[in-house]
């Protein structure tokens, strides 16, 4: 629950009060790594169809981002974007600097946990 509490507090700090107390989680990009048979299909939606004041993001997913930023055993994988919650404008800047995760995690051990960007709506 620690991660979700952190995520909700940061979301509230950046966006103020939102319609939902707990966000609904989505992923940006291609999440079909083939390793999770419980996810046989995807729903593709345009990001611009969502009001920006309803969106926050973590890079990678929130359950990985916070531990990478705070636990010593993840020091070697830590990047400036870990442990942060971003607005739409902020995540655009992060992607402009670091790129989308894509498949880099498969070939680069330093990107091992950075498989996708999580969107919280």
Model regions and ranges:
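Conserved NAD+-utilizing ADP-ribose enzyme module
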Residues: 20-22, 33-41, 48-121
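ADP-ribose/NAD+-binding catalytic cleft of ART/PARP-like enzymes
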Residues: 1-21
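Conserved catalytic/binding loops enriched for acidic/polar residues
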Residues: 29
């Amino acid at each position: 629950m620690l991660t979700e509490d952190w995520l909700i507090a940061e979301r509230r700090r950046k966006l103020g009060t939102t319609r939902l107390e707990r966000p609904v989680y989505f992923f940006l990009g291609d999440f079909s790594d083939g390793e999770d048979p419980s996810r046989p299909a995807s729903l593709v939606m345009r990001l611009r169809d969502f009001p920006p004041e309803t969106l926050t993001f973590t890079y990678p997913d929130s359950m990985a981002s916070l531990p990478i930023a705070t636990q010593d055993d993840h020091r070697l994988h830590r990047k400036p974007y870990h442990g942060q919650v971003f607005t739409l404008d902020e995540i655009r800047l992060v992607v402009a600097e670091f790129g989308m995760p894509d498949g880099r995690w498969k070939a680069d051990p330093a990107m091992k946990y950075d498989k996708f960007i999580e969107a919280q709506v």
